[in-house]
Amino acid sequence: MSRKLRIAGVAGLPLVATLLVAAPTVAASATPVPFFVSISGVGGFATPSSVYFQGSGIALVMGKVTDAGTATDFTPATTCSAGGINNLHTELLTAADGSTLTIVSHDVACWVSATRIYCAHCPYSIDTGTGRFANATGTGELNGYLELANGTFAGTYSGTISF
């Protein structure tokens, strides 16, 4: 090896050491990116005090997803003109590679007809994740409905995610 190459190699060691030390810091402080999910499927009352959701859809950063959700802990909502339900709404989104995100919303779902309940501008947070989303965090807004007449639901989540 020539003397110039040896000197260049030694001179580059501090740079390599700096990059190796900084890399975990950069990965741990992920920048929030847009997060959007559109899901739909079947749903209805599982018991008088719980609702289920089961479906699929598409999500930015996740791709195609399957969805399993519940709404529980019902109490009457006084903020809806036609009545509504305060509830704990949880959705488990599973990506094709098996990675998951659990989204939680303490929301108010308002009756908009005798058979349709709607959640508009309901805040959510990303509670947990697995696989490539193991350390994910994020927040945003849920908009969705459950139509009891035909047992269907549809919803969107829009916000940000860091992982």
For each feature predicted by the language model, list its residue ranges:
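Secretory targeting and sorting signals
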Residues: 2-27
